[in-house]
Amino acid sequence: MLQPKRTKYRKQFKGRIKGVAKGGSDLAFGEFGLKAQEPNRVNAREIEAARRAITRHMKRAGRVWIRVFPDVPVTAKPTEVRMGKGKGSVEYWACKVKPGRMMFEIDGVNEELAREALRLGAAKLSVKTRFVQRIAE
């Protein structure tokens, strides 16, 4: 699963996801993509599950780009532990996704296969997405 090799600080504030994606909202590598429609935190497990679903349906043909990276540590306290005594330990890594953010891109397959592969991948994500295609110039 994806996670940073090293970070400046071990733990982070929760924060809020406000506004729309400034960058990373257009197709940069592939012909087809999966674009986020709502703000949410997507964890590393979801990204990996979506990647596996997409590559499995494509039968290793074509190429997949993951445009999001889980760089936010999410902490949790163990169950049945009283409040206080400091912040919990890092449970998993997540990525804050804003609306309009391109999450996955694929190339080297036809539209029908790409649409189905990205639909299967989208089912693994906790954010509403839509299929996008590069417009022919």
Swiss-Prot record:
InterPro entries per UniProt: Ribosomal_uL16, Ribosomal_uL16_bact-type, Ribosomal_uL16_CS, Ribosomal_uL16_dom, Ribosomal_uL16_sf
One GO MF term: tRNA binding
Alphabetized UniProt keyword annotations: Ribonucleoprotein, Ribosomal protein, RNA-binding, rRNA-binding, tRNA-binding
Pfam short name (any one): Ribosomal_L16
Parts forming coiled coils: none
Assembly information from the UniProt record: Part of the 50S ribosomal subunit.
HAMAP family given in the database record: Ribosomal_uL16
Protein name: Large ribosomal subunit protein uL16
Originating gene: rplP
